[in-house]
Amino acid sequence: MNEPFATSHGTILIREANPADAVQFRDLRLYALQDSPTAFSADYQRNLSHPPQYWEEMLTMHADASSIFLARHENDLIGMTGIARGNTPKTRHSATIWGVYVRPEWRGLHISEELIHACFHWAKARKVVAARLGVTATNASAIRCYERCGFRITGTEPRAVYYEGQFHDFYLMYCPLDNL
């Protein structure tokens, strides 16, 4: 983590977010919710109404509970994802990866995979042994990305998202972290 990697578009740095990233994180999150509305259960209008302190608090380190990782090229925020560990003694061994997004012009460069691997590193440092996520069932490129990272489809959540008069199913995916 925090090791830059080269792409055909330039060098990318993946790192944990902090409150100083709040404005750029908000902008990217809102952009993502408009660009790919069926990929997220979050809603653009609701997120738009959040005050600045909401975004700062979201990026405050929560130590063992959760984190957000950002992909940067120079001063531009180009990708993001979050991870949240189970919050009870019976679920602390697992974590949910959420909000994976890379700007369209940066896709195809394995940035999402690097973001996910940063989540894996964070999780393993906290003795988390399994990760899970949900992905829109029609998002073939995201599914392939997650499979390259070690995830496998374990089920379907029918009608997980409702957007503009249509329901969208999510595939539920699981990745054991023991052998990574």
Regions found by a protein language model. Give the residues of each.
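C-terminal "cap" of GNAT-fold acetyltransferases
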Residues: 129, 136-143, 148-149, 159-180
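Conserved GNAT acetyl-CoA-binding A-motif
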Residues: 116, 123-134
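Terminal substrate-recognition subdomain of acyl/acetyltransferases
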Residues: 2-11, 17-20, 167-180
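Active-site acidic-Proline motif in GNAT/NAT acetyltransferases
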Residues: 103-109, 137-138
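Acetyl-CoA-dependent GNAT
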Residues: 16-20, 26-27, 31-105, 116-118, ...
